[in-house]
């Protein structure tokens, strides 16, 4: 879910990222493990694209889903070009779209791997992702990180020298758990409205749903 400008008037303007590790069971059905999540407010376009490319490589991702309407269109364009990482000196090769011929034509490298899902929201699509997410949660097909209240114990058990890290380093490791808790709160506080046999989701005044949108897109694509 893409938003590039933070807003003082609205609390719903943030780019939300979820990383999903799919694990099949003996029947071939997959469980979605949301192993990482992050929210970025006020991030500039080039920095967001670089962040996505770093995560795509580091986590060995197979696909990336982008909310391609509006502000997501320039993100799509930049992902379809080479991206230089000034920290590592590496140049990430172009990626192409896998589900939208119009975006595929915009990629200058026709041999680039087709791994980007362009999400073009509509009333029907929003209805479908809402139903899919609800069903996935009810059937236990989505697993989240543990509560932020338990994360220090988990991190201490899995990261050698955790207690010697700086407060900033500890907070960076805790943030995925904190953002997971915030995502769950969003899900609890959403309001659902049925119009013309389609479900519309909207947030209560002062609440937000950027994490919900990213999570629902992620699960639907997976």
Give the ranges of each region predicted by the language model.
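RNase H-like, metal-dependent nuclease domains and their acidic two-metal-ion catalytic environment used
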Residues: 1-101, 127, 131, 144-148, ...
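Conserved RecA-like P-loop NTPase helicase motor core
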Residues: 113-132, 136
């Amino acid at each position: 879910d893409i938003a590039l400008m933070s807003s003082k008037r609205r609390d719903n303007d943030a780019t939300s990222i979820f990383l999903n590790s799919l694990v099949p069971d003996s029947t071939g059905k997959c469980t979605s493990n949301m192993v990482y999540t992050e929210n970025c407010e006020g991030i500039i376009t080039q920095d967001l694209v670089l962040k996505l490319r770093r995560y795509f490589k580091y986590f060995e991702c197979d696909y990336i889903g982008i909310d391609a309407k509006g502000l997501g269109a320039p993100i799509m364009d930049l992902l379809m070009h080479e991206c230089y990482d000034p920290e590592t000196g590496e140049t990430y090769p172009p990626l192409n779209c896998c589900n939208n011929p119009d975006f595929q034509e915009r990629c200058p490298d026709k041999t680039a791997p087709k791994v980007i899902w362009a999400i073009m929201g509509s009333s029907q699509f929003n209805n479908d992702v809402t139903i899919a997410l609800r069903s996935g949660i009810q059937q236990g097909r989505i697993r989240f990180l543990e509560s932020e209240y338990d994360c220090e114990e988990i991190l201490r058990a899995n990261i050698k020298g955790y207690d010697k890290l700086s407060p900033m380093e500890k907070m960076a490791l805790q943030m995925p758990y904190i953002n997971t808790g915030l995502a769950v709160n969003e899900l609890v506080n959403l309001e659902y409205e049925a119009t013309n046999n389609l479900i519309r989701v909207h947030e209560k005044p002062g609440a937000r749903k950027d994490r919900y949108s990213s999570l629902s897109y992620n699960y639907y694509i997976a």
